[in-house]
C-alpha cells in the first residue's frame, strides 16, 4: 500500500493549463476515441487491451479550457489499479519524460476514496452507485442529500468506515482534513482566472476539474457522466457497498438496493435514457406555438445575474420553445447585468422564476423590500412569480445532470400544465 502511494505521488503532477493538440502521453497505438455526441469540452481516448498489441489498458481524458480557446484546462491518464496498471504507469512515465508537451495527472481507477466539492457531483455518484467513494465534502450545509448528511454526522465515530468528513468551504477548504482523508482524487468546480487551487495544488493529489457546467448544451453537461463513470467505475465482478449495504438514491434519499457493479456502464445507460427523454420533450415543445417569456433569478447586491444565451439554461429555455430576452446572446456562462439593464429589456416578461435558500417563499412585500424596482416587471404585477427553495428541494442535485427534468419544468412554465405538474418551482 505504501509503495503504491509513493509511486502514485511521484507520477501525479498538477496541471493548470497547456497547449491544445494531440496527446503527448500516448504510446503510438492511436487508441479508440469515445464518441461524444454533445460534450464539446471533453475528449476521451481509450488505449491498450483490444486497441493495441501490448498489455496494459488506460484511458486518456483531455478537458478543453472553456475560457481560453485553443488550450487545455487539464489532461488525465486513467490507469486501472493492480500490477498491470503499475507497469502501464511506469511505461507512460518514461514516455512523458522523453519529451511530453503537457504535464499530466495520473489517476488510478476505480477511485474509491475522494473529496467532492460540489453537491451535483455527489448526487451523480450516488445515482451511478458510487456514493461509497465520497469520503469528504465541502459546503455541507448546502448539500441536499440525506445520506451525505447522515454519513457526515457519523464522522466522529471512528468505527464507521463510510463516514464523510466536512472539509469546510469549497472556496477555502480545510487542508488538514483533506490530508487526513488521503483521497485518491479531489473533484472541484473550476472558475475563470481562479489562480489555481493554492495549497490543494501542493498535495500531489489529482484535482479533477469538473468544468461540465461550462458546456453550452444541457445534454453536453450530462454527457460528462461518462467520464465520472470511468473515474469511479468498478470491475464488473465487484459489488458496490457501504458498510455491507448497497446504496441507491432518488431525490436525495438513500436506501438498500441491488446496484450495477460498474459505474461506467451505469453512466452510459443512464445518459441514453436522459437523452431519449430530453429529445422527446424538445420535439413536443417544438410543435407548440411560441410560449411565454421567462426571466430567471433575482438581484444579488448591485448585480442581476442571468443565463447567457448559449448557457445550459439559455439552451433549455430555447428547447422549451419559451421566449427569452437574452436568447441572442453568445455567452455560455452567466451575464452580470445591472438591475436597470434587466428592467429596460425585460419589463414585459410573462413569468419570473428564481431560486432562494431557506425559509418561506418570498412575498411580494418582501421582494419589494429587497428591491423596489421589481414592481416594474409585468410578471410581478400579474403575480406570475415562481420560486424554488434549494434548501429543501434538491434542485441543483437533480437538475445538473438531468436536464430533461428542468426542460419539462420550463415547458410547463411557458406552455401550461399539459405536460404535468411542476416538480421544483412553486407559485
Regions found by a protein language model. Name each.
Residues 1-5:
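Positively charged n-region of N-terminal signal peptides that target proteins for export
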Residues 6-8, 249:
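General helical structural elements
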Residues 8-16:
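Bacterial N-terminal signal peptides
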Residues 18-427:
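N-terminal ligand-binding lobe of clamshell/alpha-beta domains
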